[in-house]
């Protein structure tokens, strides 16, 4: 499997199961997808044809019930419908990594479904160790633009950006809210 960043704003998500796992998976899509619908067991059609029809109306299917056999049935129907599907109890055709978003910075960590707690731990360790990641992204973007006007060599520009990235003083300034790209650039050019 590979990581992709996907625009889901036009996609509809159907989640079977409204427990903790279903709620967590719904939260993953809630702010981005066109629609997120969660069904509890009592609201799920028992007739296979009706279930097939319901699944065909959605783009992404999540089987998040505590019943492995039911989840298998849902993912089989989703597969027959050529849908993206994920299961809480088996392998789907996509995974939901542990994610962090802030500004233009996004981080996704996965253990391919084998140890989700490890993925969450790594995500939390990185984001707590570097609280100014989003600010560094903003600074690097600004510096790239400024450097293109001052330094013709792409190799030299890349070296300067790496020096800034590895400068503990710059990270500290970013954490304190000081983002003066021109002043930082003067240190390196």
Regions found by a protein language model. Name each.
Residues 1-45:
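Hydrophobic, well-ordered beta-alpha structural blocks that scaffold small-molecule cofactor pockets
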Residues 10, 56-57:
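Alpha-helix C-terminal capping/helix-to-coil transition sites in glycosyltransferase folds
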Residues 40-56, 64:
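Glycine-rich, highly charged phosphate/nucleotide-binding loops
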Residues 58-68, 105-114, 126-128:
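Short beta-strand and adjoining strand-loop segment in the mid-core
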Residues 60-65, 71-96:
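ADP-ribose/adenylate-binding Rossmann-like module
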Residues 94-104:
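Glycine-rich, charge-decorated loop segments at or immediately adjacent to ligand/cofactor-binding or catalytic sites
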Residues 113-189:
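An accessory alpha-helical subdomain
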């Amino acid at each position: 499997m590979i990581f992709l960043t996907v625009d889901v704003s036009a996609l509809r998500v159907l989640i079977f199961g409204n427990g903790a796992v279903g709620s967590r998976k719904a939260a993953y899509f809630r702010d981005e997808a066109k629609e997120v619908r969660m069904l509890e067991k009592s609201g799920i059609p028992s007739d296979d044809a009706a279930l097939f029809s319901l699944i065909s109306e959605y783009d992404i299917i999540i089987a998040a019930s505590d019943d492995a056999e039911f989840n298998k049935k849902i993912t089989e129907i989703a597969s027959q419908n050529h849908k993206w599907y994920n299961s809480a109890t088996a392998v789907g055709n996509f995974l939901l990594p542990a994610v962090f978003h802030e500004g233009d910075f996004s981080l996704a960590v996965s253990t391919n479904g084998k140890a989700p707690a490890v993925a969450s731990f790594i995500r939390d360790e990185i984001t707590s160790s570097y609280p100014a990641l989003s600010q560094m992204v903003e600074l690097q973007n600004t510096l790239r633009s400024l450097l293109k006007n001052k330094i013709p060599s792409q190799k030299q520009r890349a070296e300067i950006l790496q020096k800034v990235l590895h400068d503990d003083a710059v990270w500290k300034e970013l954490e304190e809210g000081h983002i003066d790209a021109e002043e930082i650039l003067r240190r390196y050019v």
